[in-house]
From Swiss-Prot:
Family stated for the protein in its record: Belongs to the ChdC family. Type 1 subfamily.
UniProt entry keywords in alphabetical sequence: Heme, Heme biosynthesis, Iron, Metal-binding, Oxidoreductase
Known catalytic reactions: Fe-coproporphyrin III + 2 H2O2 + 2 H(+) = heme b + 2 CO2 + 4 H2O; Fe-coproporphyrin III + H2O2 + H(+) = harderoheme III + CO2 + 2 H2O; harderoheme III + H2O2 + H(+) = heme b + CO2 + 2 H2O
Residue numbers binding Fe-coproporphyrin III: R131, Y145, P146, M147, D148, K149, H172, Q185
Pathway: Porphyrin-containing compound metabolism; protoheme biosynthesis
Lineage: Bacteria, Bacillati, Bacillota, Bacilli, Bacillales
Protein name: Coproheme decarboxylase
GO molecular function annotation: heme binding; metal ion binding; oxidoreductase activity, acting on the CH-CH group of donors, oxygen as acceptor; peroxidase activity
Cofactor needs: Fe-coproporphyrin III
Amino acid sequence: MSEAAETLDGWYSLHLFYAVDWTTFRLIAEDDREAMITELETFVKDKAVARESHQGDHAIYNITGQKADLLLWFLRPEMKELNQIENEFNKLRIADYLIPTYSYVSVIELSNYLAGKSDEDPYENPHVKARLYPELPHSEYICFYPMDKRRNETYNWYMLPIEDRKTLMYNHGMIGRKYAGKIKQFITGSVGFDDYEWGVTLFSNDVLQFKKIVYEMRFDETTARYGEFGSFYIGHILNIEDFKQFFSI
């Protein structure tokens, strides 16, 4: 049997995607719409306390295209906290006019493919802790997509010897390092949590960098032979002070 890679796991992750029911929302009286927006602002401000106490974080983006209008991404120490957040959000008045289009449940993950041998507790390493329990950037743009490692009769990632997988992931990682300073990447593991095996969330102030890195990685053997992808979601940051303009009709 092929050897499984060990993982380090951090905060639990929930991506929520919604479309706005503009047809119905425009029928609501202006005062009621404003009250809904104020309630949403209060909800988001309340969730920002977790960032300040380093007990989680969140990001909100306006999705481009017809797959969704909004992305809300939450990180928390325990899965049940994500349930509480989702339940609380669904009880907001404005949620009556938001149509769920997609969601993704996962956990911030680092694999040991590129790790060197050490007796150190990795969870005490400041660099590792910063990646497992991150402070999300407030970049202009976001890109999210789920992915699997291919497993069929011709190419089966999980049947490769671990040394071969380490080599492939090293070469794969070298491409990503070329985009340091341009893209911030977060990998979340979802085996047993959702329909794909990983979620990839990218942040950048230059949206074109998403196209460049994904295209370049298409030529990497790890992706070309073993990568399978779901839908891609691209969005622009939606700050709390932008809510009124976004929901105005």
